[in-house]
């Protein structure tokens, strides 16, 4: 009976995946495991002086809430693993 109870506890912990954290892109190719409490993935994009030749500047990351942006900055926030891709 104790073995059965222990087995049920282990299965429950594995199924619940306690301590799960979000995984977001850090750049267009690499991901990072977000710190506890940061469940939002985001990608910011904006133009700087070299936008016409290099394209937009991109910033990827994790956050507890969707970051605020300035005029001229685009942001995409999402709450699934690896959802902060950029086309």
Swiss-Prot record:
MF GO annotations: acetylcholine receptor inhibitor activity; ion channel regulator activity; toxin activity
Family annotation (InterPro entries): Snake_3FTx, Snake_toxin-like_sf, Snake_toxin_con_site, Toxin_cobra-type
Pfam families named among the record's database cross-references: Toxin_cobra-type
Location in the cell: Secreted
Cysteines paired by S-S bonds: 24-41, 34-62, 47-51, 66-77, 78-83
Region forming the signal peptide: 1-21
Record flagged with keyword Signal: yes
UniProt similarity note: Belongs to the three-finger toxin family. Long-chain subfamily. Type II alpha-neurotoxin sub-subfamily.
Protein name in the entry: Alpha-elapitoxin-Ls2a
UniProt organism field: Laticauda semifasciata
């Amino acid at each position: 009976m104790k073995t059965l109870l222990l087995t049920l506890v282990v299965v429950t912990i594995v199924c619940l995946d306690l301590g799960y954290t979000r995984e977001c892109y850090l750049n267009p190719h690499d991901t990072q495991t977000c710190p506890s409490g940061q469940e939002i993935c985001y990608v910011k994009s904006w133009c700087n002086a070299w936008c016409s030749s290099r394209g937009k500047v991109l910033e990827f990351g994790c956050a507890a809430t969707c970051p605020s942006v300035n005029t001229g900055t685009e942001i995409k926030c999402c709450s699934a693993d690896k959802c902060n891709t950029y086309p």
